[in-house]
């Protein structure tokens, strides 16, 4: 019975990391489409939009990195 709990812990950590990666991919895709839409509407604002795009993309991409760290911590500290 004890092995079942560890198996569920590993599965939960894997699901947590996978869903975070999928969510970030969807978020960056939407962010990129909105950036291109804004750049097409107002080409003179491209430098400002690009700066904001990379800042927000870094924040969106940080969430899966934090989740991977937490998932690995949960997987390896529970043993």
UniProtKB/Swiss-Prot annotation:
Site for Reversibly protonated during proton transport, residues: 61
Stored InterPro entries: ATP_synth_csu_bac/chlpt, ATP_synth_F0_csu, ATP_synth_F0_csu_DDCD_BS, ATP_synth_F0_csu_sf, ATPase_proteolipid_c-like_dom, F/V-ATP_Csub_sf
Main location: membrane
Protein name listed in UniProt: ATP synthase subunit c
Family the UniProt entry places it in: Belongs to the ATPase C chain family.
Bilayer-crossing regions: 11-31, 53-73
Subcellular location: Cell inner membrane
Organism: Blochmanniella pennsylvanica (strain BPEN)
Protein function: F(1)F(0) ATP synthase produces ATP from ADP in the presence of a proton or sodium gradient. F-type ATPases consist of two structural domains, F(1) containing the extramembraneous catalytic core and F(0) containing the membrane proton channel, linked together by a central stalk and a peripheral stalk. During catalysis, ATP synthesis in the catalytic domain of F(1) is coupled via a rotary mechanism of the central stalk subunits to proton translocation. Key component of the F(0) channel; it plays a direct role in translocation across the membrane. A homomeric c-ring of between 10-14 subunits forms the central stalk rotor element with the F(1) delta and epsilon subunits.
Assembly and binders: F-type ATPases have 2 components, F(1) - the catalytic core - and F(0) - the membrane proton channel. F(1) has five subunits: alpha(3), beta(3), gamma(1), delta(1), epsilon(1). F(0) has three main subunits: a(1), b(2) and c(10-14). The alpha and beta chains form an alternating ring which encloses part of the gamma chain. F(1) is attached to F(0) by a central stalk formed by the gamma and epsilon chains, while a peripheral stalk is formed by the delta and b chains.
Gene Ontology MF: a single term: proton-transporting ATP synthase activity, rotational mechanism
Topology within the bilayer: Multi-pass membrane protein
CDD domains xref list: ATP-synt_Fo_c_ATPE
Gene Ontology annotations for the cellular component aspect, listed alphabetically: plasma membrane; proton-transporting ATP synthase complex; proton-transporting two-sector ATPase complex, proton-transporting domain
Designated gene of the protein: atpE
Keyword list, A-Z: ATP synthesis, Cell inner membrane, Cell membrane, CF(0), Hydrogen ion transport, Ion transport, Lipid-binding, Membrane, Transmembrane, Transmembrane helix, Transport
